[in-house]
Structure formats: structure tokens, C-alpha cells
């Protein structure tokens, strides 16, 4: 699942505009400022459990995290709302599981598991980021999908002048 999610403090039903939304990436921060004008966005550090503790202690009105990470940790019940990829474009490769093996290993046991379409989309997303000379901390986003035989990418990047480009 490549989507980002909104997580509110336990017991809360809506955002508290007096406290910031916490996120750990420039990509999310840029998009959140457009989605929630007037609400502050602040960095949050630590592993997922530490971030959730900070949220529940009142340091933030909400957190924005990767859906896949919460699901893998068995914390899906903490998800308040899923953002569509149109609302918040994910990081390239977000939600994708990868397997690294040694050269020459027998991989036929993976024949029923590998997803060729997903692999093509992941490669396209990575190529988009590479073409922009982006990295883990650069505010870039990419979401690829297969439309027939064509891979289509929705992408986002921030120019050196701070302009957000999306298309």
C-alpha cells in the first residue's frame, strides 16, 4: 500500500489547529501545507512507536505516516484516514517489499510471488527520482501505475527556488 495516512491522538476525532501536524519528510511537509493551509507542520523524529507516543502526549494534532509501515507493525487500528495518492503523492517505492539475494542463487521458488508490473512501476519511480538527482531527503514524490502497456508516473518535486512542481 503506497498511501500515506493521517493518525490522530487516541480519543480525538478531528485536527486541533493549535498544534502542528507531525511528519518526518520534506515531501510530506510540502504537500500537507497545501492540503491544510493555516495548520503548522513540524518535524517528528523517532521510530513509529516513539512518534505515536509523542502524538498521544499532545505534542502534535496528528501524524502523517506510511500506511504500509503501520500495517506491517499491526497498528492499522491507529489509522484515522487514508490519503489518496492524488492528495499526497507517496515517496518512490513506498509500500513496496523488496528481496535481496546473492548472485547465482536459485530463485525459482519466487515465481508465484514476483510481480512484474509492480517491478516495472518501482523502476519507473526510481528513474524519476534519479533523473531529478533526488535522494532520501529531497522533496520528491513519484507514483507509477500501469495503463495497458504504458507506465504512467505522477510526480512532484520542489525547485531550488522553492516552487512545487507536480504533474
Residue ranges and their predicted role:
Residues 1-38:
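A conserved helix-loop-strand patch within extracytoplasmic ligand-binding domains
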Residues 34-167:
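Small-molecule-sensing regulatory modules
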Amino acid at each position: 500500500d503506497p498511501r500515506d495516512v493521517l493518525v490522530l491522538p487516541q480519543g480525538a476525532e478531528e485536527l486541533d489547529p493549535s498544534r502542528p501536524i507531525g511528519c518526518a519528510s520534506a515531501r510530506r511537509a510540502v504537500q500537507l501545507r497545501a492540503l491544510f493551509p493555516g495548520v503548522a507542520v513540524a518535524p517528528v523524529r523517532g521510530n513509529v512507536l516513539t512518534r505515536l507516543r509523542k502524538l498521544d502526549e499532545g505534542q502534535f494534532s496528528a501524524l502523517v505516516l506510511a500506511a504500509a509501515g503501520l500495517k506491517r507493525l499491526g497498528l492499522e487500528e491507529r489509522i484515522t484516514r487514508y490519503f489518496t495518492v492524488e492528495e499526497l503523492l507517496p515517496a518512490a517505492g513506498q509500500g513496496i517489499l523488496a528481496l535481496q539475494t546473492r548472485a547465482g542463487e536459485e530463485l525459482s521458488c519466487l515465481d508465484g510471488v514476483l510481480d512484474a508490473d509492480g517491478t516495472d512501476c518501482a523502476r519507473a519511480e526510481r528513474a524519476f527520482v534519479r533523473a531529478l538527482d533526488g535522494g532520501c531527503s529531497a522533496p520528491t514524490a513519484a507514483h507509477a501505475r500501469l495503463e495497458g502497456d504504458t507506465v504512467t508516473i505522477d510526480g512532484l518535486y520542489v525547485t531550488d527556488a522553492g516552487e512545487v512542481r507536480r504533474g
